[in-house]
Swiss-Prot record:
Originating species: Treponema pallidum (strain Nichols)
Cysteine pairs bridged by disulfides in the record: none
GO biological process: fructose 1,6-bisphosphate metabolic process; glycolytic process
Protein name: Fructose-bisphosphate aldolase
EC number assigned by the record: 4.1.2.13
Enzyme active site: 93 (proton donor)
Binding-site list for Zn(2+) 1: 94, 191, 234
Residues that, per the record, bind dihydroxyacetone phosphate: 192, 235-237, 277-280
InterPro entries per UniProt: Aldolase_TIM, Class_II_FBP_aldolase, FBA_II, Fruc_bis_ald_class-2
Function: Catalyzes the aldol condensation of dihydroxyacetone phosphate (DHAP or glycerone-phosphate) with glyceraldehyde 3-phosphate (G3P) to form fructose 1,6-bisphosphate (FBP) in gluconeogenesis and the reverse reaction in glycolysis.
NCBIfam families given in the database record: cbbA, fruc_bis_ald, PRK07084.1
Cofactor: Zn(2+)
Length: 332
């Protein structure tokens, strides 16, 4: 059994309180390998941003729980080596059972998400409450994220064909009965790189898909019901057109790719939304760089020669997110 404090990690309690008050959001970047972790820490150190290292159950299986725990410890030491002790959270993304959440907590996670959003309301409440009871009883308080509403799309093992918006009249009851520390809501974001169908979008003069706007009216109503409570946005990648085109230029095929416009994320970050999840953008940035290297240098076979540029592109992207989108730069 490992305490997250022994790894140098923090939970989200104070970070979220400061973010809500300060009108910015903390980045939650998914990772499952060394290069992704290097890019995240470098970007957040250089922008002086707190960060949530986010791991899905699939990523945890891929990376191995023991290696992952030590990667998190290494991330803290690496940031210190780079000269800035930024706050770092290790968070389970989309935990689907009490057992998984307990396993992650006991292996050093400082925050977990229990996703019972696909369950009937009462079952979601009961499951989320059990996770909170365990996490909050620890000597080192572990924070818990719950979810109301369902996001469409695919993210590792999480699959949903249709979105179901969060119902504002449920949030106060849910938060009170479960004891969750933050709440993921559904206001129009989706998982994956094709967040909307072409039929849901319009097109600009260049033929680029323009998605429908987020439901800020739902967010505003939720904020009225639970003022100051930390809100989380999943599926918040912007799916930059330049990365999609780069992937396709070098042999990929990513039809109908569309994400959440950054101006809408900026607006959300100034509200009670204090955690914004970004995964697909990172995948696109790395894949574009890797395809470019392997296509233009056909004799290259040293992984460092294509994973290095992928890491550098990811760092560049995340520095932009921290500084220009989420407002987390300078908040460490």
């Amino acid at each position: 059994m490992t305490s997250y404090k022994a790894l140098g990690l923090v939970n989200t309690k104070d970070l979220f309180a400061k973010a809500v008050k300060g009108g910015y959001a903390i980045p939650a970047y998914n990772f499952n390998n060394l290069e992704q972790l290097q890019a995240i820490i470098q970007a957040c150190v250089e922008t002086r941003s707190p960060v949530i290292l986010q791991v899905s159950s699939g990523a945890r299986k891929y990376a191995n729980a023991t290696l992952l725990r030590n990667m998190a410890r290494g991330a803290v030491e690496y940031a210190h080596e780079l000269g800035v002790d930024i706050p770092i959270v290790l968070h389970l993304d989309h935990g689907d059972s009490l057992e998984l959440c307990i396993d992650c907590i006991e292996s050093g996670f400082s925050s977990v998400m229990i996703d019972g959003s696909a369950l009937p309301y009462d079952e979601n409440v009961a499951l989320s409450r059990k996770v909170c009871e365990y996490a909050h009883a620890r000597a080192d308080y572990v924070t818990v994220e719950g979810e109301l509403g369902v996001l469409a799309g695919v993210e590792d093992d999480v699959v949903a064909e249709k979105s179901h918006y969060t119902m504002p009249d449920e949030v106060e009851d849910f938060v009170k009965k479960t004891g969750v520390d933050s709440l993921a809501i559904s206001i129009g974001t989706s998982h994956g790189r094709a967040k909307f169908t072409p039929e849901q979008c319009t097109r600009n003069a260049d033929g680029v898909l323009i998605p429908p706007p987020l439901r800020f009216d739902i967010l505003a109503e939720i904020e009225k019901r639970i003022p100051g409570f930390p809100i989380v946005l999943h599926g918040a990648s912007s799916v930059p057109v330049e990365y999609v085109r780069e992937v396709e230029r070098y042999g990929g095929n990513l039809p109908d790719s569309v994400g959440i416009p950054e101006e809408q994320l900026r607006k959300a970050a100034k509200s009670a939304v204090c955690k914004v999840n970004i995964d697909s953008d990172g995948r696109l940035a790395m894949t574009a760089a890797i395809r470019r290297v392997l296509t233009t240098k056909v004799d290259e076979f040293d992984p460092r020669k294509y994973l290095g540029p992928a890491r550098d592109e990811l760092k560049k992207l995340y520095m932009h997110k921290n500084k220009e989108v989420l407002g987390s730069a300078g908040r460490a």
